[in-house]
């Protein structure tokens, strides 16, 4: 049972996941530790959960989120190996570090312990994330509990670990490119006379609604695009310009560059 939840790291992504988890779990069962204690204390005050030190999280929590950057993971886990090895009860580690395999996390932790590897994205901070995950040595019951705890963060999808880096390039890196697109749409609106705030609002809501239509209709994006383009209309003229400028190829190249 994943009754107690700990976070080692309370940065942007760790904080976003902690906020989501505290909506599904009793905050009094959530423990936060961070290299800068003040950051953990501020988040704990916001959420009504507890603060402690890394060793206490490693020794007491059933589900431990490893919420540090990949280059900091070994430094985080090395001092905790003995504590983890001496635990009498079962625990699950959850890593959100890009590029670190489950096997590498287990090696750093010093044991073949249960691990869930997740690839969240920044929209998880508003409950609209797309989070891929894969597991090792995790029971079906533990996975079900984990999914319940993570549900407030957004959609979760199990993928083979061999695909999780590619998935992250689409949904993890993708928000940055969507923000660029929203900014460019707003710039175009301003060039046509719209106030900046209105142009940004219209662009962002349009992207939100368009994405919802793709997900809920089940239609191919190309079919939805065709439905907007009237013969000889203004939309198809804009589509023509984007095709001439190489939008599709540029986006595909961005995904591939991020993957490589």
Where are the model-predicted features located?
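NAD(P)-dependent Rossmann-like dehydrogenase/reductase catalytic/cofactor-binding core
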Residues: 204-260
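NAD(P)+-binding Rossmann beta1-loop-alpha1 motif at the extreme N-terminus of oxidoreductases
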Residues: 1-59, 128-129, 190-192
């Amino acid at each position: 049972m994943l009754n107690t939840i700990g976070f080692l790291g309370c940065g942007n992504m760790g904080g976003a996941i902690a906020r989501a988890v505290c909506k599904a779990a009793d905050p009094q069962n959530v423990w936060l530790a961070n290299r800068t204690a003040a950051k953990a204390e501020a988040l704990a005050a916001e959420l009504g959960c507890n603060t402690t030190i890394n060793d206490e999280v490693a020794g007491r929590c059933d589900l431990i989120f490893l919420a540090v950057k990949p280059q900091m993971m070994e430094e985080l886990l090395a001092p905790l190996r003995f504590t983890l090895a001496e635990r009498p009860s079962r625990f699950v580690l959850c890593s959100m570090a890009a590029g670190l395999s489950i096997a590498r996390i287990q090696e750093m932790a010093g044991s073949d312990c249960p691990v869930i590897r997740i690839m969240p994205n920044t929209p998880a901070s508003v409950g609209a994330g797309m989070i891929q995950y894969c597991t090792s040595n995790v029971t079906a019951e533990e996975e079900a509990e984990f999914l319940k705890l993570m549900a407030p963060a957004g959609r979760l999808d199990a993928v083979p670990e061999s695909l999780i880096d590619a998935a992250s390039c689409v949904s993890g890196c993708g928000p940055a490119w969507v923000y660029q697109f929203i900014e460019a749409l707003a710039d175009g609106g301003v060039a046509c006379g719209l106030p900046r705030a209105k142009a940004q609002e219209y662009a962002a809501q349009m992207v939100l609604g368009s994405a919802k239509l793709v997900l809920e209709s089940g239609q191919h994006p190309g079919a939805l695009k065709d439905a907007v383009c009237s013969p000889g209309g203004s939309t198809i003229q804009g589509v023509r310009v984007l095709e001439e400028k190489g939008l599709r190829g540029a986006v595909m190249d961005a995904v591939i560059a991020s993957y490589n």
